[in-house]
């Protein structure tokens, strides 16, 4: 791709500085990256606003010969004075990260155009729902891919990206590889961070699915309205040249608000709304136990379908119902979906049950790390009627601090005992995090244990379990690491529980 062709395609990008003796017609562009370490000579280094004061450092380290920055005469002029004159500087009026996805897609020939992409957004349930959809489609012979918190899956490949929604350049490369391997349908998680930062700009999305919206990420979003608008962004980037549709849980927190906003903005968009005001898709007759979950899903025309699944918890009633509606939207067979839901593979770190050797005690490992998710998982474990429920949790450091006391109140109210421990403390002092959590307990409430060492806390929690008791280990789920300071260490809640039970 010639530089001149790129500038014609993106008139919002202007040529700021060009080395003397060179012709823009002769400059070849291979790709665009926002990670300076990934750049090659003929790449564009996209200098995101979030880099802040380190722009000069990252530009110096980048191998890229082209640099894209936001228009700022002071910053650009300072850089032009000190940078190697062989660099080509491009400028734009907005955060370059918002253009990165469109440029990446353009340079790769728009790989997402040839894929059916179903994107799921929401505070809780994204990973479960995308994994359920992946299983349903795969069982019906569809070559499908999965992108999300647990990683990227397609064919026999599993890739850990480290992000729920990969950066725009990585995402487009993944989609290109999927297309080349014959993948036709992709189920992906769309995080609020990814949507707000423009990681999905330029991606052709056929369907948007919304699970719920409750408090989280207020360290990143200015308030809940900003968080909501970031989620709504998914429906603004739908590709209406495809058979586009939306799926949402009308009765979920902020579900009705989103429904009416979509309806006002896109009145012709097909919406499958679970438990909406017209009761077209109504859930009833819910049955929950440790053997599985069942319910009746009402369909249009006064029809009903009994849904049974091995997935546990009341939240999986909503997840499987949303998956069923999404499956209808993409043309999956109803009977085959019903059969597949009975035997969905265990989703790592989501209501994952581990029994002691004699099965007299159990632990549940779950990713719940928000107030709403913690309440849902505790209530779901309660449905199994354990003789004693001990909830072990912490809160991530350098993240939304306002949820800490809220999670304490929920744990105290719904559990028999509470253990406070570290999650990913990052650069905060673990004891300070526990202090802030503890402010949410009622006067006089004393947790069973307060231990910053998560492994020790799990061992103590297991040792305190009576026969018929359950330890809920919440917060990290599938994660196989713990971040202490700036160091990422191997750590797995599942492994620690298994060791505490003497299973290996």
From Swiss-Prot:
Keywords: ATP-binding, Cell cycle, Cell division, Cell shape, Cell wall biogenesis/degradation, Cytoplasm, Ligase, Magnesium, Nucleotide-binding, Peptidoglycan synthesis
Catalytic activity line of the entry: UDP-N-acetyl-alpha-D-muramoyl-L-alanyl-D-glutamate + meso-2,6-diaminopimelate + ATP = UDP-N-acetyl-alpha-D-muramoyl-L-alanyl-gamma-D-glutamyl-meso-2,6-diaminopimelate + ADP + phosphate + H(+)
GO CC terms in record: cytoplasm
Listed GO biological process terms: cell division; cell wall organization; peptidoglycan biosynthetic process; regulation of cell shape
Binding site for ATP: 122-128
PTM note: Carboxylation is probably crucial for Mg(2+) binding and, consequently, for the gamma-phosphate positioning of ATP.
Top-rank EC class of the record's enzyme: ligase
Essential cofactor(s): Mg(2+)
Single Gene Ontology MF annotation: UDP-N-acetylmuramoylalanyl-D-glutamate-2,6-diaminopimelate ligase activity
Top-level taxon: Bacteria
Subcellular location: Cytoplasm
Matching InterPro entries: Mur-like_cat_sf (IPR036565), Mur_ligase_C (IPR004101), Mur_ligase_C_dom_sf (IPR036615), Mur_ligase_cen (IPR013221), UDP-N-AcMur-Glu-dNH2Pim_ligase (IPR005761)
Residues modified to N6-carboxylysine: 231
Pathway assigned to this chain's UniProt record: Cell wall biogenesis; peptidoglycan biosynthesis
Motif Meso-diaminopimelate recognition motif positions after renumbering to this chain: 423-426
Binding site for UDP-N-acetyl-alpha-D-muramoyl-L-alanyl-D-glutamate: 36, 164-165, 191, 199
Binding site for meso-2,6-diaminopimelate: 399, 423-426, 475, 479
Enzyme Commission number(s) from the entry: 6.3.2.13
HAMAP family reported for this sequence: MurE
Family per similarity comment: Belongs to the MurCDEF family. MurE subfamily.
Record NCBIfam families: murE, PRK00139.1-4
Function in brief: Catalyzes the addition of meso-diaminopimelic acid to the nucleotide precursor UDP-N-acetylmuramoyl-L-alanyl-D-glutamate (UMAG) in the biosynthesis of bacterial cell-wall peptidoglycan.
Name of the molecule in the record: UDP-N-acetylmuramoyl-L-alanyl-D-glutamate--2,6-diaminopimelate ligase
Species this chain originates from: Leptospira interrogans serogroup Icterohaemorrhagiae serovar Lai (strain 56601)
Lineage: Bacteria, Pseudomonadati, Spirochaetota, Spirochaetia, Leptospirales
């Amino acid at each position: 791709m010639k530089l001149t062709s790129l500038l014609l395609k993106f008139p919002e990008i202007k040529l700021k500085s060009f080395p003397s003796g060179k012709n823009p017609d002769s400059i070849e562009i291979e790709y665009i990256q926002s990670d300076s370490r990934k750049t090659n000579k003929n790449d564009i280094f996209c200098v995101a606003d979030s880099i802040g004061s380190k722009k000069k450092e990252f530009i110096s380290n980048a191998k890229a010969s082209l640099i894209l920055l936001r228009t700022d005469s002071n910053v650009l002029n300072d850089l032009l004075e000190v940078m190697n004159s062989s660099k080509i500087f491009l400028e734009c009026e907005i955060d370059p990260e918002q253009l990165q996805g469109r440029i990446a897609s353009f340079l790769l020939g728009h790989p997402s155009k040839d894929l059916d992409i179903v994107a799921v957004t929401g505070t809780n349930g994204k990973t479960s729902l995308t994994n359920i959809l992946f299983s349903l489609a795969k069982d019906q012979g569809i070559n499908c891919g999965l992108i999300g918190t647990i990683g990227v899956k397609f064919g026999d490949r599993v890739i850990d990206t480290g992000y729920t929604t990969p950066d725009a350049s990585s995402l487009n490369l993944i989609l290109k590889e999927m297309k080349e391997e014959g993948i036709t349908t992709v189920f992906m998680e769309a995080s609020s961070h990814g949507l707000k930062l423009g990681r999905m700009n330029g991606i052709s999305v056929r369907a948007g699915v919304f699970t719920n919206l409750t408090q989280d990420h207020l360290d990143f979003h200015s308030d809940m309205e900003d968080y909501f608008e970031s989620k709504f962004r998914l429906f603004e980037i739908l590709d209406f040249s495809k058979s586009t549709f939306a799926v949402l849980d009308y009765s979920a927190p902020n579900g009705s608000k989103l429904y009416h906003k979509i309806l006002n903005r896109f009145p012709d968009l097909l919406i499958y709304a679970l438990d909406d005001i017209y009761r077209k898709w109504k859930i009833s007759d819910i049955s929950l136990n440790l053997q599985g979950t069942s319910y009746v899903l009402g369909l249009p025309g006064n029809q009903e379908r009994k849904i049974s699944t091995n997935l546990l918890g009341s939240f999986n009633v909503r997840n499987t119902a949303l998956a069923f509606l999404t499956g209808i939207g993409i043309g999956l067979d109803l009977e085959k979906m019903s059969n597949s839901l009975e035997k969905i593979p265990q989703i790592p770190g989501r209501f994952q049950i581990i029994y002691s050797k004699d099965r007299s005690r159990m632990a549940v490992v779950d990713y719940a790390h928000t107030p709403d998710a913690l309440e849902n998982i505790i209530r779901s474990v309660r449905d199994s009627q354990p003789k004693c429920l001990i909830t072990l949790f912490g809160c991530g450091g350098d993240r939304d601090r306002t949820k800490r006391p809220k999670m304490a109140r929920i744990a105290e109210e719904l559990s028999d005992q509470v253990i406070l421990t570290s999650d990913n403390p990052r650069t905060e002092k673990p004891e300070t995090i526990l202090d802030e959590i503890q402010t949410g307990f009622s006067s006089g409430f004393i947790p069973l244990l307060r231990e910053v060492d998560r492994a020790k806390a799990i061992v103590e929690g297991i040792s305190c379990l009576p026969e018929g008791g359950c330890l809920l280990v919440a917060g990290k789920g599938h994660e196989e690491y713990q971040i202490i300071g700036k160091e990422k260490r191997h750590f797995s809640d599942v492994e620690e529980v298994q060791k505490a039970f003497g299973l290996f």
